[in-house]
Each structure stands twice: as C-alpha cells, then as structure tokens.
C-alpha cells in the first residue's frame, strides 16, 4: 500500500452531479487514495467532505450554460472534453465510468485502469430506450432526428476509447459480459460496496413497502405506481429528483402511495430498516440500493434480471419477479407475503458487500498490475 500512496494518481469520472451508485464508488476510491486528483466533465458536487482540499479539474463543458446542466445534451462534446485533459504527469489513472471518461489519453508508461459500471448504455445496450425517453424538453424532436444519424460515429469513438485502458474492472458479472460483447475486452469483477457497519439494522418491520432512487425513466417508478394503485397496499417512495416525471407520478398516485422528496441519507436508512420489503424494479448493471436494504435486515423484491441476480438470494434475502410489469410484480408481492425471512441472515449476507472488501480487492488488483 505504501508503494501505491507514493504514486501520483488521477481519478477520472464522467460527471459529478447527482449522488448515486457511481458517486459512492468514487467516494470510496477517494478514501483509498486521499491524494488523488479528480478529472471530470462537470462538477456540481456541493460541499461534501470528500471533496475538501482536493484538486478537481473540470472540462470546458463546465463553463457552457445549458450543457453544464444536462449530461445528455453534453454527450456530443464529452469525447473531446476527455481527450483534452493533460494526464501526462500521472503514474496511475483510474476511470470510474459508464460513459466517455475511459477515453482519456495517457502516456505509454502510465497504468490506466477502467472501473466500468457499464458500457455506454445510450450507444449500446439501451440505445432504443434512450431514444424513446429523451429528456431534452422542446429539443426532443431534434434529438430523436439527430441521434440516429450520428450514433454510428459515436459508437466507433466509444469502441476506440475502450482500447485505451490497460485493464478493465467490471462492477458485476453482468457488466463483464457486456464489456466482452461490446468492447471485446476481458475484465475482472470487483463488486461496489457500502459502509455496511454504519447502516442501521432492525428486526422490527412496519406495514409498508419502500422504494427509493433518482426519479428517471429506467428506474421504473411508473411500474411501482401502477402496481400499487392496483393493489392498494401501503408504500413509501423516496427520491431526490424533483422533475416532470416525479410530479406526474405523484399526481397519478392514490392515497396509499406516499412520496418523500429528500436528500437525507439518515431518513432513507431508517425507511429501509422499517420496511416490510424493498422493491427494486429496474434492470441495473449492479445496483447498490438493494444491498443497503439488505444491510438493514429488509428483504428485497427485485426484477429478476441484471445485477440483482448477483446480490439477492431468492428465498433467503428476497424474491424475484419475472416480467417488468405490474401483474408480475403484484403476483410476486402476494407470494412474498406468505413467506418468512430472517433479518439477521439478510444482514449477514449484506456484509459480504462491505466497503472493506472493495478496498482490499481494488488495492490487490492495482498492485498486481504494477508488478506486471
């Protein structure tokens, strides 16, 4: 570890704006490498302690109004932004990415590692979904007309950029398969982790279900609302995203659905710990939120695809629903309510995703590559 701390390290990420799973991974990397500098297209990370006294270098996009507020609009400029960064003085460059930041250019002697949350979704696996759910407002028609005409060249750039890292780390087996499919690169899996020991645990559950996350289309808040409008059961939904979708779904919700607009992590953890079950309807590349729920002793009802298959153990820490619709979800909720779960076993399973494991595995990986 002493060797590593003597190296000059840069951590590159796509953008720092909202706080989600990728940002939690970034935070843990910064704890592991307290002297690392940050490179990112835009930074609106607020006053979090982890960024205090830290060198943070942003791209030209930071100074362009409108673009600096919309990472979707800025996607056309990010390849240039990341290729413009001067990383020539760094010994190790680590990109934590689901988009373009893997495309930074380094010197031949620099060890460049990509921690990949997913190959760029809007170029590859979820291209058609993104086309159909653009959030450009009045510019949506232009985006839908333009994107099909330029996506081929963007895919070529993304594929070329995927050859720049010396090594890939995948955040899940699910992501590793995508990295192989779209980039033809091998990767080693190191799971993202949470500070499990500091997540409150409770054996006592109350009569409500719970879901939280950013209120954006692929997180499937609409599925939750449709299912619970139908079944009439109590659910609390927490989000930090006050947008058009949030307001539309809140208006559509029946009285059994309680919306909570909050950034308060302590409140979120408390809601996790008291819920009878946490719902997880999206197909995620990995998904840290179900781990937070399980750490609190709460079982998970998850869509049976993607990263949830690597974290939730059916019948022990939760159950899966087979189709991404309200009929399948409600059928599984009815099945879940006839089951019994051991909160202690659920918590113990979550401990395998504690941040100490992430730290150990990442340091071992980098040291091994330095020896090569």
Predicted regions mapped to residue ranges:
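Short hydrophobic beta-strand element within catalytic cores of glycosyltransferases
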Residues: 299-303, 312
């Amino acid at each position: 570890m002493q060797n590593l701390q003597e190296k000059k390290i840069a951590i590159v990420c796509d953008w720092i704006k909202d706080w989600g799973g990728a940002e939690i991974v970034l935070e843990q990397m910064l704890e592991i490498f307290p002297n690392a500098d940050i490179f990112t297209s835009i930074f609106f990370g607020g006053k979090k302690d982890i960024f205090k006294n830290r060198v943070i270098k942003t791209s030209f996009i930071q100074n362009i109004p409108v673009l600096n507020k919309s990472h979707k609009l800025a996607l056309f400029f990010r390849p240039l932004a990341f290729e413009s960064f001067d990383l020539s003085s760094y010994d190790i460059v680590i990109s934590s990415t689901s988009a373009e930041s893997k495309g930074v250019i380094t010197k031949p002697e620099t060890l460049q590692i990509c921690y990949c949350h997913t190959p760029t979704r809007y170029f590859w696996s979820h291209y058609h979904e993104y086309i159909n759910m653009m959030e450009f407002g009045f510019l949506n028609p232009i985006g839908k007309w333009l994107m099909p005409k330029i996506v081929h060249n963007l895919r070529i750039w993304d594929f070329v950029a995927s050859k720049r890292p010396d090594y890939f780390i995948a955040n899940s087996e699910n992501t590793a398969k995508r990295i192989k499919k779209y980039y033809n690169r091998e990767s080693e899996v190191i799971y993202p982790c949470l500070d499990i020991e500091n997540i409150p645990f409770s054996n006592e559950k109350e009569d409500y279900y719970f879901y939280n996350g950013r209120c954006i289309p692929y997180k499937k808040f609409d599925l939750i609302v449709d299912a619970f409008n139908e079944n009439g059961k109590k659910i609390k939904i927490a989000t930090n995203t006050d947008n058009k979708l949030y307001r539309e779904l809140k208006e559509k919700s029946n009285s059994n659905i309680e919306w909570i607009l909050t950034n308060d992590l302590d409140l979120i953890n408390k809601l996790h710990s008291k819920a009878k079950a946490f719902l997880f309807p999206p197909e995620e590349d990995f998904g840290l939120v179900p781990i937070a729920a399980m750490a609190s002793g709460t079982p998970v009802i998850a869509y049976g695809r993607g990263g949830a298959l690597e974290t939730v153990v059916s019948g022990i820490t939760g159950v899966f629903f087979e189709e991404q619709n309200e009929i399948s979800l409600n059928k599984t909720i009815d099945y879940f309510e006839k089951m019994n779960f051991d909160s202690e076993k659920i918590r113990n399973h979550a401990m395998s995703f504690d941040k100490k494991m992430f730290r150990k595995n990442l340091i071992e990986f980098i040291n091994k590559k330095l020896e090569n």
